[in-house]
């Protein structure tokens, strides 16, 4: 008998729903979110014909069981808003861990599998560095806002020393990121560094959080990053197209890269941006269009293994 599994992940537990093919109800069991709990779940799964597993991204709490299962089973990790939307589409509004697991098992029977591919150790290390740098930059930004509002010279001096420390740590992480990017994929890192607007930080972020670069179509890669325009039409109203969702780390770095490319005389994005402005596009819309064009160019470069031509 074929089974479909839905897993609701928390920091301490895994609630797992087991649905037989064609059924929309089934048993639900709880396991510890630990190596021992993962082994226990895998022993049970080994006795079943598991066709598809769906779980939500939960900020990293899912990584243990995800990495353990992805080597053996077809596992799809979805964004949490997709799970919420699916539950509401079923007309269910109760919120429990078991109910969420059952909804995900139902979803496993419905959606086309998008098999999760675990990152390599080098990619995982690089992701940690990119996330750590981002956290320190946010802390430094908060600290600098406090400095501007500070009423005590003593406290201001203390905050300025904290600022200097954070800046030094950020610089150190950036050096480690450049080294880790080369360790993850040196040829690809060198290829991307040829592109005007892409520096070492941007390249490291792309290697860490967009391993699909060069492996997906232009529409797919645009949707993954969150720069694909979606139509907003209802009745007689035809609203402006909007971007949504995607991968924030990659989208932020693409925004900065597009701005740098627009200012560069060596980049064709400068002319593309000016042409969009002349057609009456708002500046932000023109920048997002340049982000998408830059991403599609990078996707083609990696797919075809061609250098930057300008």
Feature locations, PLM:
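Phosphate- and other anionic-substrate recognition elements at nucleic-acid/protein interfaces
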Residues: 1-164, 263, 285
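Short alpha-helical scaffolding segments that buttress acidic/His motifs in well-ordered protein cores
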Residues: 107-108, 126, 192, 206, ...
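Phosphate-backbone recognition surface of nucleic-acid-processing proteins
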Residues: 200, 206-279, 283
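Helix-hairpin-helix/helix-loop-helix acidic hairpins
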Residues: 144-201, 210, 262-265
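Acidic, carboxylate-rich catalytic segments that either coordinate divalent cations
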Residues: 264-310
């Amino acid at each position: 008998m074929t089974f479909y599994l839905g897993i609701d992940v928390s920091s301490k537990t895994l609630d797992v729903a087991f649905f037989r093919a064609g059924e929309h109800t089934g048993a639900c069991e709880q396991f510890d979110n630990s190596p021992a709990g993962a082994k226990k779940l895998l022993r049970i799964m080994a006795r079943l014909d598991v066709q598809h597993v769906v779980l939500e991204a939960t900020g990293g709490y899912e990584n243990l069981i995800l990495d353990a299962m992805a080597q053996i089973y077809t596992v799809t990790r979805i964004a949490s808003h997709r799970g919420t939307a699916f539950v509401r589409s079923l007309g269910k509004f109760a919120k429990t861990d078991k109910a969420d697991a059952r909804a995900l098992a139902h979803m496993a029977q419905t959606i086309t599998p998008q098999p999760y591919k675990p990152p390599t150790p080098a990619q995982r290390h690089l992701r940690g560095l990119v996330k750590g740098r981002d956290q320190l930059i946010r802390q430094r930004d908060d600290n600098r806002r406090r400095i501007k509002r500070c009423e005590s010279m003593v406290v201001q001096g203390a905050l300025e020393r904290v600022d200097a420390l954070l800046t030094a740590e950020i610089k150190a992480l950036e050096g480690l990121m450049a080294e880790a990017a080369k360790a993850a994929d040196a040829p690809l890192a060198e290829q991307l560094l040829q592109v005007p607007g892409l520096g070492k930080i941007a390249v490291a972020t792309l290697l860490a959080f967009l391993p699909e670069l060069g492996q997906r179509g232009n529409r797919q890669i645009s949707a993954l990053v969150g720069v694909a325009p979606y139509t907003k039409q209802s009745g007689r109203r035809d609203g402006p197209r909007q971007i949504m969702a995607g991968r924030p780390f990659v989208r932020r770095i693409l925004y900065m890269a597009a701005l740098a490319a627009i200012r560069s005389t060596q980049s064709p994005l400068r002319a593309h941006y000016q042409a969009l402005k002349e057609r009456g596009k708002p500046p932000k819309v023109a920048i997002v269009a340049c982000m998408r064009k830059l991403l599609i160019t990078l996707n083609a470069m990696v797919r075809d293994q061609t250098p930057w031509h300008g």
